[in-house]
Structure formats: structure tokens, C-alpha cells
């Protein structure tokens, strides 16, 4: 468990304390953006492999057990995470490259300006609730913290990089899904999202639901 906690702390530091902060700006100024992104990607990949190994081998204590009815709710609550994740790949100004930032929010950006991180947050929160043991709490809680803290961190980074266009983008979007739409600052345009992201998201959700035991050794639903 100690190794898992140390690796989790390192993951949070790298993805929240470094990426998106002025410390990142200082490192980029020295080695360049491409070198930073390549190093960051490789380091993250290695670290996530180590996290999985540490999680699988950690001693754990069960704090609660999700009842069958709750597991059904959690299973269906995962569906929006898959749809958000798939939709986030269409011209995402808050992702790497910031494509289309000056053009204003479109598609899933009207729902939340951080669709990918929001999908990770939903995924992590559901797995924290559904597992209920200390090792899973540390492992999935790490990604939950990273996703939730990463949203304002990216906001701050983009505010520094794009002071001319970012305020207008923020004024028409929200972190919380559908908040900007509910407040009248934007409107849902389903045609901009298209049919493919939701359909693929549903298919992936159903596939993971069905094969979860085969892939990860644990069934999603208990009958």
C-alpha cells in the first residue's frame, strides 16, 4: 500500500502540480514544448503501468460493499462517461493543441468545456463507490483528484496562453455539464455533436459491461 500511495502522490503532483502550472511554463521555456509533451507522455505511461501493478499487489481492506441495486445505478451512470469521452475527440479546444479555441464552443463543448476530464472524473468516482476497498480508493481516487483538479488547472493555463480569446470562451461554457446551457449562456446543438460519438460510446459501454469480468476479473453486476 505504501508504494501505491507514493506513486499516486507522484501522479497527482505531475498532472496537477506540474502540468498546467507556471512550473510547466518554466520547464517548457528550457526544453521546448514538443520535448516536454513527449517526456510527459512517456513518463505518464510508465507511471500508470506502475500504478496498476502497485494497486493489484497492494494489501487492502474493505470499507463498504456496494449492494446489487447500487451496482445497477453505477453501471448506467457510466454511460455518459463513454459518450463524453468519444465526443471529446471532435475539435476539443481544451485538449492538446487547443484546436478551434478562437472559434467559440461547439458540440460537446457546449455541454462542458472539459469533456474528456469529466469522463475520467465520472469513471473514477463510480469505481471508488463501486469497489469500496482502500487500495481501490487510493488508485481510482488518484484519477478522480487529477481529473477534478485538472479542469481549473487547464483553465488557468489557457488563460495565460490565450488572454484575448479565453475569456469569451469561458463566458459561454461551464465545467459542470449543462450548467452554461441551464444558465442561458449557451444552447445544446445535437447536430454539432453528431451521431457517431454517442453511438460508439453506447457500443463501448455495452461491450465493457458485458466483458468486464473477462477483461478485469470482476463482474459489473451481481445477480
Task: Please place each PLM-identified region on the residue numbering.
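Hydrophobic transmembrane alpha-helical segments in integral membrane proteins
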Residues: 1-13
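Alpha-helical transmembrane segments
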Residues: 3-4, 67-83, 135-147
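Membrane-interface helix-loop junction between the first two transmembrane segments
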Residues: 16-35
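Portal/gating segments that form or line small-molecule/metal binding sites
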Residues: 43-107
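Loop-to-transmembrane boundary segments
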Residues: 107-108, 114-115, 179-201
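A contiguous pocket-lining binding segment that forms or flanks enzyme active sites
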Residues: 109-164
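Membrane-proximal soluble regions of multi-pass membrane proteins
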Residues: 156, 160-191
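Juxtamembrane boundary at the C-terminal end of a transmembrane helix
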Residues: 206-223
Amino acid at each position: 500500500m505504501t508504494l501505491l500511495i507514493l506513486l499516486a502522490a507522484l501522479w497527482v503532483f505531475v498532472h496537477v502540480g506540474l502540468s498546467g502550472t507556471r512550473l510547466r511554463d518554466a520547464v517548457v521555456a528550457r526544453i521546448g514544448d514538443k520535448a516536454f509533451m513527449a517526456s510527459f507522455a512517456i513518463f505518464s505511461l510508465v507511471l500508470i503501468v506502475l500504478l496498476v501493478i502497485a494497486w493489484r499487489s497492494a494489501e487492502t481492506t474493505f470499507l463498504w460493499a456496494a449492494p446489487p441495486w447500487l451496482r445497477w445505478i453505477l453501471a448506467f451512470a457510466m454511460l455518459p462517461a463513454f459518450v463524453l469521452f468519444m465526443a471529446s475527440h471532435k475539435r476539443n479546444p481544451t485538449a492538446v493543441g487547443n484546436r478551434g479555441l478562437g472559434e467559440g464552443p461547439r458540440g460537446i463543448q457546449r455541454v462542458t468545456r472539459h469533456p474528456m476530464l469529466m469522463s475520467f472524473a465520472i469513471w473514477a468516482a463510480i469505481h471508488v463507490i463501486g469497489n469500496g476497498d482502500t487500495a481501490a480508493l487510493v488508485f481510482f481516487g488518484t484519477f478522480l483528484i487529477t481529473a477534478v483538479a485538472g479542469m481549473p488547472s487547464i483553465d488557468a493555463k489557457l488563460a495565460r496562453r490565450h488572454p484575448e480569446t479565453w475569456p469569451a470562451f469561458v463566458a459561454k461554457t461551464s465545467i459542470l455539464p449543462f450548467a452554461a446551457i441551464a444558465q442561458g449562456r449557451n444552447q445544446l446543438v445535437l447536430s454539432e455533436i453528431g451521431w457517431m460519438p454517442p453511438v460508439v460510446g453506447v457500443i463501448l459501454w455495452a461491450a465493457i459491461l458485458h466483458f468486464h469480468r473477462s477483461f478485469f476479473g470482476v463482474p459489473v453486476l451481481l445477480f
